[in-house]
């Protein structure tokens, strides 16, 4: 397992998860579609559908979020990244064929009380981040993450009259709660995230509200609204540290409305995931075993038409 900690992330700081692998030779991040700006991860010669991409061991970039999900996690939220090459364990999902990428988000109990930054580049990207954490008492703590970015500068360095990078804007809000009782062995996390993302690609001068149903310009617009909730509970037996059990549950609703030229494509993806694990030993700590149960449910509603 390769661990990318906060010090390693500082060497090549990225605005989001898709830009956080610059210093790691095990992973290639490429544009699978230059026109729409879709990024795809490749590991051991296989691409994203064969990778398990999780957030704190809960699958997150899958289904409807496969195309743009890597850009939905801001870089300032990331505490560390764990990379497993090759076929991985099915403990947290069955999709790890080429490998697993797990992202750890900053914890309320250990995060900075206050963090704020602004970013602007000559490529027209502007970004703002706010993070605040509060310890309510010795057991409870909470944190609030707010991220916003804007890309409104048209760039066409190769003079082909098409945008080199998508225009867009994103608002991302995350609220986390943490409960820790070390004496009794209980740890719990709860979170809710709301995200709104808008992207526009196509020819220079394309204005969706004017040119959508005309032949003067070709363009595309992808609007995404997403909600994620999760609950994690763990218990370690105080006198038997090798013995523990954990429960994870997550729900997400991904609504995407898009058009590509005259073709409309809308998708509504609802996903539920649950996981129960029990860890212990046989005889001594050299012989360990894990028992568990995974359940996942996906509901897709897709609409494709010509207008």
Residue ranges and their predicted role:
Residues 1-10, 40, 81:
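N-terminal periplasmic "start-of-domain" segments of outer-membrane beta-barrel proteins
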Residues 18-62, 79:
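Extracytoplasmic beta-strand/coil segments of soluble accessory domains associated
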Residues 25, 72-113:
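A beta-strand signature from Gram-negative outer-membrane beta-barrel systems
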Residues 39, 97-99, 112-116, 126-130, ...:
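Hydrophobic, lipid-facing positions within transmembrane beta-strands of outer-membrane proteins
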Residues 40, 58-85, 173:
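Short acidic/polar hinge/loop motifs at secondary-structure boundaries
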Residues 52, 80-84, 100-106, 113-122, ...:
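Predominantly transmembrane beta-strands of Gram-negative outer membrane beta-barrel pores used
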Residues 116-120, 144-150, 190-196, 247-253, ...:
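Transmembrane beta-barrel strands of outer-membrane/channel proteins
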Residues 151-172, 180-243, 251-271:
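Flexible loop and strand-edge segments within Gram-negative outer membrane beta-barrel domains
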